[in-house]
Amino acid sequence: MPQKLQIEEMNRLDVAAFKAAEKLPLIVVLDNVRSVHNVGSIFRTADAFRLAGVWLCGITATPPSVDIHKTALGAEESVDWRYFSTTSEAVAALKAEGYVVASVEQCHRSTLLTDFELDSAQRYALVMGHEVHGVAQDVVDASDLVIEIPQMGTKHSMNVSVAAGVVMWEFVRQWRALGL
């Protein structure tokens, strides 16, 4: 029968070891995400998958924040983050650094997540949008591609931290399948 792992069996990295460890070449960009709980959850998932960072834009809350810390469980201390006053500035900086920028949004001519194949030679940035308005159209326009999560229900809407986790995992899954 399966037995739950004890904390000491999980080989968890401390913050210093995490900072020094190689990261997956994926940055999550939060475009005016208003809920500090969503921000904290995204930090926690980015830590779980050892991503390169989280970039916070516009009205998105930034550390230090008691509420971010509560949801992130301290991941805001391990995951590198930057703040930009606009998401457009963040996208421009990412493109200047050679990242492929992918907005996660429901759009005409989007690529379904199930059809997306990453290029292992590329570094990626995922733009996650505001809880009500999604990714701003000017950011979608500036993106290299748009990824859409297939949905079959009545709402066609997912919580931004849940959607971020779904897409992050697909990137991690594909990198692992390539042996990276």
PLM feature segments, named:
Residues 1-180:
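Post-transcriptional modification and biogenesis factors for structured RNAs
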